[in-house]
Amino acid sequence: VAEVKAQVLMARQFPRDEQMAAEKILRECARPTLADAAVYTFPRGKETVTGPSIRLAEVLARNWGNCTFGYEVLERRQDNRGVGYSVIRAYAWDLETNMYISRQFELKHWRTTKNGGYKLTDDRDIYELEANMASRRIRACILQMVPGDVTQIAVAACRKTASSGLAEKMADKEQREKLISATVRIYE
């Protein structure tokens, strides 16, 4: 409780500068690695679903400032068939405005396959499933917390970076080596 009070107090003492936060977000969106991973796309039925990725949402929250996000496994149980499930809460909290957004969900410890599926019993498999599914809910919470226009501008900036050809140039081994040696010279 004391740690949370301290975080809220610090956030109110040092409020975010929205202009500076937006500039930091745009600087990060100029990075080819983020730009390439900024938007997810997957087929759902006859349509294609797209949106800001989990990685972009994390960048938005980190640079927006005065907020925290994550997930908690509230409990693990077994159903009447012996299949385990977790109750999980994903959240994003703007400490400055005290806006707390959460999503609570139940997650069956089950891996679906083309031939049906099987229950998960290995702790690592269960943890990875929880983390993966919680990340999607965290993204939704962050995108609800950060103003929509900031998100739209970030997505547009990432698309511009990705389409500028900069990503391809950075992938070129020779370009990477030049960048590394130039960076080394700066710090020598």
Q: Whereabouts are the PLM-identified features?
A:
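Polyanion-binding surfaces on beta-sheet-dominated domains and ring/shell assemblies
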Residues: 1-87, 91-188
